Regions:
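N-terminal-proximal low-complexity accessory segments that begin disordered
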Residues: 1-97, 502-503
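C-terminal anchoring/interaction modules
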Residues: 2-15, 368-369, 384-503
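Structured, mid-chain assembly/scaffold modules that mediate subunit interfaces
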Residues: 74-237, 443
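Short amphipathic alpha-helical coiled-coil/interface segments
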Residues: 110, 337, 341, 470-473
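C-terminal amphipathic alpha-helical
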Residues: 130-153, 329-431, 484-485
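Short coil/turn segments at secondary-structure boundaries
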Residues: 153-155, 269-277, 355-359, 452-458, ...
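Short amphipathic alpha-helical segments with coiled-coil-like heptad repeat character
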Residues: 205-210, 352-354, 460-469
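Extended, charged amphipathic alpha-helical segments
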Residues: 231-370, 411
Length: 503
């Protein structure tokens, strides 16, 4: 019954009809014609490709941070928007495992001690240089610039809380190390030992030195094997089997570098033309006079003179002077550069105007739309950072904290019920805050948002804590005889007083 599909279509009439060509459905982008022949096959973000290219991309990304104004701005924006002043802990310890009731005493206790630990550089950093917020900013910068951030956890440290952290440069983890793992069930991929079946990280191999007593030799190189439980490794995963990260700006690096070189060439050309005001021409058959003028100090003033306003050149008989009009900087440079920077900003996922510091022709609506898209991207990055860095650090800190006498009356067996938490990342103020505050007030009034959600948007504070503080402030005002400012009703402008008898 399906023989119809096997018959070729006849084109034309009569016995001399010819068989027509059969149409084949296919993706146009998969064609291998002349136009697309330079488009080579790409295997994606495979471990093999990353091992071959990571070191080069990473060093070039670091160079751009040093020498490119735009990329320096991007890395600064990245760490300030992802981390900012740090993350605020919102502990949610329950009375018992499975009980939704919050243990308020334990909540205040845990939040206070974690805040105290995170502010103390000697407690947080093995080097004693960074608080937890500063360490997070450094890790975020490494994540953007090098493609990954790495922290080693030092448990049972000789400190009050027993936990210290150490930031490690990503290039200390050898991306070219591949082979058999520590056991038959593991394999090493780009310096990371993973389980063959689950692909879960088991250990990390860091470059060691021959004098390091903890180093083991592998392929004639010393390495230090660190269990995955003691390593915090953040990177953006583009492939399921990917074990290492690549710089987040990899798609824009090439164009940004070429644009920097173009800028330099344009600047050199402009400077050269600015320094060359004109050219002297000797008459025919008298070119030897140039040599004589160069030998005679007094006469050489004809050839090389200082350019001063209102002065004219006095030339020997027969000589000529050709003034040069600078052609650089080219009038089209600005529009061309802005177009290229838009592509670079798109590859970085940032808003162009702020990235390029170009606010010409920008309207409020366009800034708002671009800012919203950029903040959506940063919000996702904040979630990733909390999930991969901040949350594991807190869990490790809490486990160590409960083993210390400072944690009394809480003990290690309370870990399960106390390890309920969330972290509030930094938020942003709006360009027109009055309208946004009014919109939030309407949302709360109609039940579209809660006071807790709105409070979290403004600095990450806690609504219940705000209520307690407001109660204390109102009591203090009442005791001091200070009247509370009247509330503004709908349709009333700030500062407008009601007339007597007006309701």
């Amino acid at each position: 019954m399906f023989g119809f599909f096997n018959r070729a279509k006849k084109v034309g009439k009569g016995p001399t009809a010819v068989t027509g060509a059969q149409a084949v459905r296919s993706f146009g982008v998969a064609e291998m014609g002349r136009e697309l022949s330079p488009w080579v096959f790409d295997g994606g973000f495979s471990n093999v490709e990353i091992a071959a290219a990571l070191a080069t991309i990473r060093t070039r990304s670091r160079d751009m941070q040093k020498n490119s104004p735009q990329f320096s701005q991007y890395f600064r924006q990245f760490k300030n928007n992802v981390v900012g002043r740090g993350f605020t802990l919102r502990a949610q310890p329950c009375e018992a495992v499975g009980d939704p009731a919050i243990d308020e005493a334990a909540k205040a206790f845990i939040q206070y001690h974690f805040w105290k630990w995170s502010k103390d550089r000697d407690e947080v950093d093995l080097t004693g240089r960074k608080s937890f917020a500063r360490m997070c900013r450094l890790v975020a910068e490494n994540w953007a610039r090098d493609g990954e951030g790495i922290i080693l956890i030092e448990r049972n440290a000789p400190t009050v809380y027993g936990l210290q952290l150490r930031v490690v440069r990503p290039d200390a983890l050898d991306e070219k190390m591949n082979g058999q793992g520590f056991t038959a069930n593991t394999v090493i991929r780009n310096g990371v030992e993973i389980d063959r079946r689950t692909k879960r990280p088991i250990a990390y191999y860091f470059n060691g030195t021959a004098e390091d007593p903890m180093a083991a030799w592998y392929n004639s190189k010393p390495y230090v094997r660190v269990p995955a439980s003691d390593v915090i490794h953040i990177f953006t995963q583009h492939d399921e089997c990917q074990t290492r990260g690549i710089p987040l700006g990899h798609a824009s690096l090439k164009k940004a570098k070429m644009l920097d070189e173009f800028d330099l060439s344009e600047l050199v050309a402009a400077r050269d033309e600015a320094n060359t005001t004109g050219i002297f021409h000797a008459p025919a058959d008298r070119e030897d006079e140039i040599k004589k003028l160069n030998e005679d100090t007094a006469a050489s003033n004809y050839v090389c003179q200082k350019s001063e306003p209102g002065t004219k050149y006095v030339l020997p008989p027969g000589w000529d002077y050709d003034p040069k009009t600078p052609q650089h900087p080219n009038r089209e440079v600005s529009s061309f550069k802005n177009s290229m920077l838009r592509d670079v900003a798109s590859g970085l996922g940032v808003e162009y105007a702020c990235f390029a510091n170009d606010w010409a022709g920008v309207s409020f609506s366009s800034v708002r739309a671009g800012t919203l898209a950029e903040r959506d991207n940063y919000t996702t990055l904040q979630d990733d950072f909390v999930e991969m860095v901040v949350a594991p650090v807190f869990k490790a800190w809490l486990a160590q904290f409960l083993t210390r006498t400072i944690a009394n009356p809480y003990v290690p067996s309370d870990f399960a019920r106390l390890c309920e938490f969330e972290f509030q990342a930094r938020t942003w103020a709006w360009v027109d805050p009055m309208k946004d505050v009014q919109a939030d007030a309407i949302a709360v009034e109609h039940g579209w948002k809660t006071n807790e959600e709105v409070t979290a948007q403004y600095g990450g504070s806690d609504f219940k804590e705000n209520c307690a503080r407001l109660a204390e402030e109102n009591a203090a005002k009442k005791q001091a005889g200070i009247l509370t400012a009247p509330q503004i009703t709908k349709g009333e402008k700030p500062g407008k007083e009601k007339d007597e008898g007006e309701e």
